[in-house]
Amino acid sequence: SRNRIVAISHEHDLRPFEYICQIPQKKHYTQSIYFRWYDLFYYSTLAAYCSLLERTHHPLEDILEWFYHRYLPEGLGIKGFHINLLRQNVGFNARAEAVANCIEGIFNQYSCYVSKGSVDWDYIQYQSLKEDYRKIPSLIKAKYFYGKGKPFQSLTYLLFSDQSILRHAKVIKEECNCFYDLICQGTMHLDDFADYQSEPIQRLINKGYLYISGDGVLSWTNPYVIRALRDLYHFDFCETAYYSQSSRNLEAIQFLQESDMILLGETLLSEQEGRYFNYYLNTISSSNGPQLRNLYAHGKVYGPKVNHEYNYYVLLRLLVLLTMKIYDELIGITDWKSLIDITRRI
């Protein structure tokens, strides 16, 4: 997953019948079949894992508190972080409320740590922040890169979509899902495609993505550029540090930036991961979510329709994911590879 949250929703996950059935709304978080499946899978998996940890007398709440109260100050020399979770001897409604408060607390504490270099509780107490999880700052410059604009969307759709006009060829040498798979066979010639397909293929050649080799085979001009585009098509964002480890990958990012195909971002969570958090917690970027932070912050948690156990495990999942993203970032900046300011190289 390359430090990505894999459970987030992707627009291209929607099947054609889902596009037909869903009514477009301005602030609507896309919920494909895959997204719903992931939601149920992680709920049941985390519930089972927590039950196992409790039987071994090492509840997940203790592990999370150990990370913030012991590991950060003693292992990384970062002091001041604090969370307060409730144990299994209280009801799920109280436990869910405690986790919701901890998520909001870590949002404020980490934002303060990045901006001021320490967790300043006086500053946090008087700081009024709107909990938009897309905007938690990062210690790493240009942490992510994203596809940019309609030219990027048109290009990646042409290359990687199973609905692309380039998916099929006159001579099918092997069943393929997209144009990318066809070219990767290493046996496709321009004559293998229909006349109506020649114009978009020629456009790909003119833009430097394809070339015709001496024996007439269509090949990728720079496979590293194509792999980066494929990564962006399937996951919507990439972590720049991963691509900075290879000079070929770094050249691919430079090419895409010079082609105005990508833009850079420097937040703890990617734009898509931030929307995932917002979907569950508030109404900042979507209006069709459970709004769990608002639910527990405003005392609207009573009644037969409120499933506190489900809400608790969803909130606990978010706290674990947020903790893992913080851990990955803090470990990353102590690694020699992250000492390079990536923005100077792209």
Model regions: which residues?
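Charge-enriched, short contiguous segments at helix-coil
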Residues: 2-86, 125, 275-346
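Short, amphipathic alpha-helical interface elements at domain boundaries
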Residues: 18-19, 26-189
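Amphipathic, oligomerization/interface secondary-structure segments
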Residues: 120-346
